[in-house]
Amino acid sequence: MAERRAPSDAAQLAPAPQRPHLILGSASPARATLLTNAGITPTIWHSGVDEDALIADAGDRATDPILVTQLLATAKARDVADQVRSGAVPGIPAGHVLVIGADSMLAFGGKVLGKARTAQEILERWAAMSGRSGVLFTGHTVIDLTNDRQVDRT
C-alpha cells in the first residue's frame, strides 16, 4: 500500500493567483457603480474615441444596434489598451491587466438612439416613449493585456 504524504511546505505556501487589475474604458457612472457594487474597484480611464465619427463611418450599418454597440465598445477598449501600453495611464500596476470597453444604444420606433446630448432631447425622448418600450443593446469588449486576447459580446 502506498504511503500518503502531506503536501510539501512549498505547495502549501504557494501564492494565490493574482487578481487582474481592471481598467474600465467608459465614462458611464452606472458601469463604474455596478463594478464597485460587485466588489471590483476599476481604474476609470475614458477613451479618446470619436463616437459620432465611427457611427458616420459605419454608413448604412449604423442602423444595426448590435453592430454599432459592438463597434463602439471594441473601439473604446482598443483605444484604452493602446493608452495603457504606451504608458499614458498612470498608476497601473505590473502584472495581469484587463481593459473593458462598453457601449449601449436604445432601439426605439425603428431608430437607433445614442446618448441624448441635451436636457431637451431627454425630455423629448421620455415623452415619445411614454407607455411604449424599446430594446437596450449593450456591447462589451474585454482585452487581456497579458496576451492580447480579446473577447466581444453584445
Locations of the language-model features?
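Glycine-rich phosphate-binding loop
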Residues: 94-104, 108
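Acidic/polar active-site rim loop that often engages polyanionic ligands
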Residues: 54-58, 106-108, 147-154
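N-terminal polybasic phosphate/anion-binding patch
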Residues: 2-98
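Residue-level signal for inorganic ion chemistry
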Residues: 35, 73, 103, 122, ...
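Phosphate-binding/catalytic loops
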Residues: 2-12, 135-154
